[in-house]
Regions:
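Soluble FAD-dependent oxygen oxidases
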Residues: 2-510
Length: 510
């Protein structure tokens, strides 16, 4: 009997050929009148497609189907994918049969949890395995829940709350898919109190490149269990569900205020100082946002937010560290305080499909003498960029780490950036894409990043895999995303997927 490794290696040539052909057609076209379809350069007969469809208990969507127009879309409108075939599996068997079909026909497969990849990685011209139908959230007892990879965060938060008043540290955008955020790490507004999303995962079910389904846990394939907690999605197999240990629901108190953009430098220095000194308790995650261009208030303002599970009086006292006598006075008449129903109730979140480019940086600490210089450099050059017009805008977001995130050692999960103090996200949005708008957007975000990243990387470099960046070179992104953990990720990849069937733009390489 041929083993898994032999089977994968014997089919590697077909996949390589399919990958070479996948760029032939940017948009899948149907051959006229000959009973065949062109799938990413591979000609497949109607009979073959029909037989495949009959074997899938879920849904198969082809370009000729009415559902295709919406099903093909991803969140980032910078990408306009036209996959050859979209499969929404309903079972492990559906996934295994889809893998088999893609292999035999030389079609590249990508996995989509929620479609929020910053670089459009869940689109393409081949097969999209859309996990949105595998979205159940089921209580297992004692605060344990089984969460389907395709469950959107709005459902996750709602179902956990309704089944015993539980929650989980997770993201703020309610349309993100759980499978993607959990495998990349999982930032959120409860992270300092309860850790990353992946820190609550106790086991997962994964369909491998040979079609077999395995458990990943401390007692069953511990290396795979380690890898899917921070290694990113789409590298090792198709995660069907995760068993997670929830935490008791706590009210999330949100306190938002504004500072004039003229004090942006002092505002960021204050956040860095409070974070480095440990004065921000782990019950609080703080954010600082600079919006410029069309999204900015007039006059432009910095947005500061505290996300707190502390008591109302404690939250007020923490806020005074920022705006009190030893802080910076807030802009009068702006800002508000409220209790959020869930961490997905984000006052700054853009939930509709958007055109944007994004970048990230993990800040391990800035030398005090350098902090002001770094801030002034990009403040002066970028927060008043004349190229940002009425149709586009930029945003720089700082979020505090530490707390429970840092309780786990960098090598204990694949998420390596445990000792980072701050996570920085750079976003350039377009309301209406145009060649001029794209140029302006790229000029701003790439220039801003060039100003900032080389300086902060002196104190510890890194980027976040779930904020993937297609400007990074093949020689750069593995080290920036995973650092010293990358060799172990590669070893796990070579063992489970030696032919690199699950190959994406920035997936772990063999």
């Amino acid at each position: 009997m041929i083993g898994r490794r032999g089977f994968l290696q014997s089919t590697g040539g077909a996949i390589a050929a399919g990958a070479a052909l996948s760029g032939v057609l940017g948009r899948t076209a149907r051959a006229a009148g000959n009973g065949t379809a062109n799938c990413a350069g591979a000609t497949i007969s109607d009979g073959t497609l029909s037989r495949f469809r009959s074997r899938i208990s879920g849904t198969v969507i082809l370009p000729s189907d009415s559902a295709y127009g919406s099903a093909r879309l991803v969140y980032n409108q910078r990408f306009d994918p036209y996959p050859s075939i979209i499969v929404r599996p309903a079972s492990e068997s559906d996934i295994a049969r889809s893998i088999e079909f893609a292999r035999i026909n030389g079609i590249r497969m990508v996995v989509r949890s929620g479609g929020h990849s910053y670089i459009g990685a869940s689109g393409g011209t081949g097969m999209v395995l859309d996990m949105s139908s595998m979205n159940a959230v089921a209580p297992l007892g004692d605060g344990m829940f089984r969460i389907g990879s395709g469950a959107r965060l709005k459902r996750v938060y709602g179902d956990l709350r309704c089944n015993g008043n539980w929650t989980i540290p997770c993201g703020s955008c309610d349309t993100v898919g759980f499978g993607g955020i959990a495998q990349g790490g999982g930032f959120g507004y409860l992270q300092r109190a309860a850790g990353l999303t992946c820190d609550r995962v106790r086991s997962a079910r994964v369909v491998l490149a040979d079609g077999t389904a395995v458990d990943a846990s401390p007692d069953a394939d511990a290396d795979l269990y380690w890898a899917i907690r921070g290694g990113g999605g789409g590298s090792f197999g198709v995660a069907t569900h995760f068993d997670v240990e929830a935490i008791p629901y706590q009210t999330l108190r949100v306190s938002l205020w504004y500072w004039p953009l003229s004090v942006a430098q002092q505002a960021l220095e204050l956040m860095v100082d409070l974070q480095q000194s440990g004065e921000i308790p782990r019950t609080v995650t703080a954010a600082l946002v600079f919006n410029v261009g069309a999204a900015a208030l007039s006059p432009p303002q910095c947005v500061a937010v505290l996300f707190s599970t502390a008591s109302p009086s404690e939250t007020t006292a923490i806020k005074q560290l920022f705006v009190g006598p030893n802080g910076i006075p807030a802009t009068p008449g702006l800002g508000y305080d409220y209790d959020a129903e869930s961490p997905a109730c984000d006052p700054m979140e853009v939930t509709e499909h958007s055109w944007y480019r994004a970048k990230s940086a993990m800040v391990y600490g800035l030398p005090a003498s350098d902090t002001g210089a770094v801030i002034r450099e990009w403040m002066q050059r970028r927060l008043s960029d004349p190229m940002l017009g009425a149709s586009n805008y930029g945003s720089i977001n700082f979020l505090t780490l530490g707390g429970a995130v840092a309780d786990i050692a960098p090598g204990d999960t694949a998420f390596v950036h445990r000792q980072s103090l701050l996570e920085v996200q750079f976003l350039g949005y377009l309301n209406q894409a145009s060649p001029a708008g794209v140029r302006a957007n790229d000029h701003w975000i790439r220039g801003t990043y060039a100003d900032v990243f080389p300086r902060i990387s002196l104190a510890g470099s890194g980027c976040y895999v779930n904020y993937c960046d297609d400007d990074l070179l093949e020689s750069q992104w593995p080290g920036l995303y995973w650092g010293a953990n990358y060799p172990r990720l590669q070893a796990t990849k070579r063992r489970l997927d030696p032919s690199d069937f699950f190959h994406g733009r920035q997936t772990v390489r063999t």
